[in-house]
Amino acid sequence: MPRVKRGVTARARHKKVLKLAKGYYGARSRTYRVAVQAVTKAGQYAYRDRRQKKRQFRQLWIARINAASRQNGLSYSRFINGLKKASIEIDRKILADIAVFDKVVFTTLVEKAKEALAK
């Protein structure tokens, strides 16, 4: 069996990791051993935060809808309940955009929700 020297493979692996660590501070971008740890940790953060991003945006949308609906005299939960009773199906992302950029339309939605709750 011929002898296998791993120089080419090792260099390729090192280059790959150091390329991923480009832009990191200090030894994290220059030293392979430290760069491996930094890239691994960055990957863990990226994986975790891709999931947290969805939760955080939903929280933001709810906060915006709540603030806008309270300005019109209705709490968030009662507003959403009123929309469901009025069979208005608009998701929270669009509701938040309407609340921020088109206050007149949002006010009419609140009125429709109030009417549905009164019935």
From Swiss-Prot:
Which UniProt key words apply to this protein? Ribonucleoprotein, Ribosomal protein, RNA-binding, rRNA-binding
Q: Which N-terminal residues, if any, form the signal peptide?
A: none
One function term, GO molecular function aspect: rRNA binding
Determine if ATP-binding is one of this entry's keywords: no
The record's listing under Pfam families reads:
Ribosomal_L20
Q: Name one GO cellular component term.
A: ribonucleoprotein complex
Keyword RNA-binding on entry:
yes
Instruction: State the similarity comment.
Output: Belongs to the bacterial ribosomal protein bL20 family.
Protein name per its UniProtKB record = Large ribosomal subunit protein bL20
Q: Which organism is it from?
A: Shewanella woodyi (strain ATCC 51908 / MS32)
Protein's gene:
rplT
